[in-house]
């Protein structure tokens, strides 16, 4: 979508582009310098993710990331951009106690520069999604593999593989949309299920290991640049392999998402 004007994109901009069949390119971002590079390369949404616990802080999970740390990084990203849409994760423990507490914490993220908050959880979070969305806070719901639930889920594994699990995820998606979610992120689910859910919903879907039929795609920045420690997950493509600069790698990612060339078959489940 056109980012030539200095006006910051809105959820309406993204929804309109989605309705016209344009794919949405999303990357995580945690600082002003990378934010400026990613915006210039044409990324539509910068997700200030609690994944910073892994790739910035060197921790083994996202669970220790605090709200104050998220606010700091949202401010950094906001200062480095002018047009791109900014989404922020609500970290573990900041939205589960009550909708009222979630609202107070979400307000702090929005005041720091976020335009949307992302909440992990299925239909049990519908009340919180509704509470926030009715009070002016756009919400992206997150289902499938949820890193904040890693201990409950028994590790990082594909979700929705059985008929019952797939049905549960479809129900979650519909109930979260009904509750007012403006976007849905689906992580590590079979591609056919990602396509089914995308067709069921009227809101944009963002996939990470959820197939090419989603309205858009997201990757962790460090993964797509090939600089994360350890083996890259199956759903990741290292875009630095064929690029001579970070700017080119990110531009190639955006183009691949927009053209539907990423994810390819080998990146799906």
From Swiss-Prot:
UniProt keywords, alphabetically: Cytoplasm, Magnesium, Metal-binding, Pantothenate biosynthesis, Transferase
Quaternary structure, from the entry: Homodecamer; pentamer of dimers.
E.C. designation(s): 2.1.2.11
Entries under PANTHER family matching the protein: 3-METHYL-2-OXOBUTANOATE HYDROXYMETHYLTRANSFERASE (PTHR20881:SF0)
Active site per the UniProt annotation: 187 (proton acceptor)
Keyword Transferase among record annotations: yes
Binding positions for Mg(2+) per the UniProt entry: 50, 89, 120
Residues at which 3-methyl-2-oxobutanoate binds: 50-51, 89, 118
Catalytic reaction equation(s): 3-methyl-2-oxobutanoate + (6R)-5,10-methylene-5,6,7,8-tetrahydrofolate + H2O = 2-dehydropantoate + (6S)-5,6,7,8-tetrahydrofolate
Protein name (database record): 3-methyl-2-oxobutanoate hydroxymethyltransferase
A GO CC term attached to the entry: cytoplasm
Native organism: Nitrosomonas europaea (strain ATCC 19718 / CIP 103999 / KCTC 2705 / NBRC 14298)
Enzyme class: transferase
One of the GO BP terms on file: pantothenate biosynthetic process
CC cofactor note: Binds 1 Mg(2+) ion per subunit.
InterPro entries: Pantoate_hydroxy_MeTrfase, Pyrv/PenolPyrv_kinase-like_dom, Pyrv_kinase-like_dom_sf
Gene Ontology MF annotations: 3-methyl-2-oxobutanoate hydroxymethyltransferase activity; magnesium ion binding
Pathway the protein contributes to: Cofactor biosynthesis; (R)-pantothenate biosynthesis; (R)-pantoate from 3-methyl-2-oxobutanoate: step 1/2
Essential cofactor(s): Mg(2+)
Subcellular location as annotated: Cytoplasm
UniProt record similarity statement: Belongs to the PanB family.
Superkingdom of the organism of origin: Bacteria
SUPFAM superfamilies: Phosphoenolpyruvate/pyruvate domain
Function statement: Catalyzes the reversible reaction in which hydroxymethyl group from 5,10-methylenetetrahydrofolate is transferred onto alpha-ketoisovalerate to form ketopantoate.
